[in-house]
């Protein structure tokens, strides 16, 4: 067991009840192009085309062979693009009776004997290959690449998240089948990282190693797991994926169907009934959350966590591919008179500067305000309080800000993704957004190194 002692469990109100309810049906689903780092699409459909569940929508010019398939059957009603023709989303209006592309059903007994190339081909054809991401760089792997190890994230320490063991309990067999499929992809180990005390199936499988983590966030981040168990470098890559995608892998190979069902958490101070909902990949947030939000006109809907999620609005008003929650917060569009003099009766700070820490409050209802503008980076030890990895965060962040990629690599930036620096952003007195800064540096490293 690995215990994470440095970090932060944000005491935010609206924690979801750990029971699964069926969500209201949605009429629109989407693939969000911004979920895939560096992806440049070659479109295979146009607006107005009819598609089946699992049918090809577009391929990736940057990674030949990678296919992105429809998360639902119906009509392609919008292909949204942003600056420089960047793909934002492909929106599908669902049919009442969805047709689906069928795939080969191998059955349970055949999983151990599957050929690696057959596994790769079926994952690519179904579009489930895009559930895999590399570390470093967090890109969709090439179909001919081979990882040193594969990490399954079966723990979630984000604020207001779902308990993975509750979700896996309903699909134990499919989860084990998915682990067997993953083992065909790597000569190394398949690490299943979970909460201490959680009963996660598959520990008896050959080549599968269960690892327990305990402590504060980011104990549930794959970057933390990789750092302690199988560090990466430019010449050594690992892959990772979410536990619900493992279940989908198992169902694809045993039943021959693409399972797009997902369980997500809905929580936050503005959630009427914080709980777990069973919905589907790419679900429309406006349709899914209809009737779930208090004061919807003054609420920000975040696909993902408060630390690393994306605002679900406009062409991105859908569940992100790698998100497992919606967080509902009050918009921070009001200014407090002399707010900097406030004693902070109901405000949270890791630096202990508010009276609230002496009042014993264990839940807060924050809004989206940053409580100040950008300013100089001030090294006051805040980053060290929330960084459990064996790196020097202040020095690393400084090198990232100035774009010193050589120093950043020496200080460990290749192990990180945007979510790994989210806590540094939260505690930063200078209001820096370190996630985008890290991504810019990783892009430069990938081009030059």
Curated annotation (Swiss-Prot):
Keywords: Ion transport, NAD, Sodium, Sodium transport, Translocase, Transport, Ubiquinone. It catalyses: a ubiquinone + n Na(+)(in) + NADH + H(+) = a ubiquinol + n Na(+)(out) + NAD(+). Pfam families: NQRA_2nd, NQRA_N, NQRA_SLBB. Its EC number is 7.2.1.1. It comes from the Bacteria. It is an enzyme of class 7 (translocase). One of its GO terms (molecular function) is oxidoreductase activity, acting on NAD(P)H, quinone or similar compound as acceptor. GO terms for biological process: sodium ion transport. InterPro entries: NqrA, NQRA_2nd, NqrA_C_domain, NQRA_N. NQR complex catalyzes the reduction of ubiquinone-1 to ubiquinol by two successive reactions, coupled with the transport of Na(+) ions from the cytoplasm to the periplasm. NqrA to NqrE are probably involved in the second step, the conversion of ubisemiquinone to ubiquinol. Belongs to the NqrA family. Composed of six subunits; NqrA, NqrB, NqrC, NqrD, NqrE and NqrF. This is Na(+)-translocating NADH-quinone reductase subunit A. It comes from Chromohalobacter salexigens (strain ATCC BAA-138 / DSM 3043 / CIP 106854 / NCIMB 13768 / 1H11). The gene is nqrA.
């Amino acid at each position: 067991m690995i215990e994470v002692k440095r970090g932060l469990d944000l005491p935010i109100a609206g924690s979801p009840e750990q029971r699964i309810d069926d969500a209201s049906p949605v009429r629109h689903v989407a693939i969000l192009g911004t979920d895939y780092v560096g992806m440049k699409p070659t479109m295979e459909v146009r607006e107005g085309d009819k598609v089946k569940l699992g049918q090809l929508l577009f391929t990736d010019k940057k990674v030949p062979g990678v296919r992105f398939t429809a998360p639902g059957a119906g009509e392609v009603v919008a292909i949204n693009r942003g600056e420089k023709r960047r793909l934002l989303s492909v929106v599908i209006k669902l049919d009442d009776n969805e047709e689906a592309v069928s795939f080969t059903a191998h059955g349970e007994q055949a999983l151990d004997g599957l050929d690696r190339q057959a596994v790769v081909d079926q994952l690519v054809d179904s579009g489930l290959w895009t559930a895999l991401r590399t570390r470093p760089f967090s890109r969709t792997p090439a179909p001919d690449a081979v990882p040193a190890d594969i990490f399954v994230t079966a723990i979630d320490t984000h604020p207001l998240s779902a308990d993975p063991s509750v979700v896996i309990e309903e699909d134990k067999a499919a989860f084990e089948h998915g682990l067997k499929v993953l083992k065909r992809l790597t000569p190394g180990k398949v690490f299943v990282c979970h909460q201490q005390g959680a009963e996660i199936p598959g520990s008896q499988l050959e080549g599968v190693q269960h690892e327990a983590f305990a402590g504060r966030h980011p104990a549930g981040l794959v970057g933390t797991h990789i750092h302690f168990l199988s560090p990466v470098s430019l010449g050594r890559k690992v892959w990772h994926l979410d536990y619900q995608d493992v279940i989908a892998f198992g169902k694809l190979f045993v039943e021959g169907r693409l399972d797009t069902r997902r369980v997500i958490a809905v929580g936050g101070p503005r959630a009427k009934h914080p709980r777990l909902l069973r919905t589907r990949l790419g679900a429309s947030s406006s349709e899914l959350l209809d009737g779930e939000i208090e004061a919807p006109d003054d609420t920000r809907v975040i696909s993902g966590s408060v630390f690393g999620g994306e605002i679900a609005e406009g062409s991105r008003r859908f569940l992100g591919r790698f998100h497992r929650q919606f967080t509902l917060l009050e918009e921070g569009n009001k200014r407090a008179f002399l707010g900097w003099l406030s004693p902070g009766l109901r405000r949270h700070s890791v630096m202990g500067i508010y009276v609230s820490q002496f009042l014993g409050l264990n839940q807060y209802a924050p809004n989206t305000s940053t409580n100040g503008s950008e300013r100089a980076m001030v090294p006051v030890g805040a980053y060290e309080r929330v960084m459990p990895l064996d790196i020097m965060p202040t020095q690393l962040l400084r090198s990232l800000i100035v774009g010193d990629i050589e120093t950043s690599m020496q200080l460990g930036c290749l192990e990180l993704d945007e979510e790994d620096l989210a806590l540094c952003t939260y505690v930063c007195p200078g209001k820096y957004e370190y996630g985008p800064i890290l991504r810019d540096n990783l892009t430069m490293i990938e081009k030059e190194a």
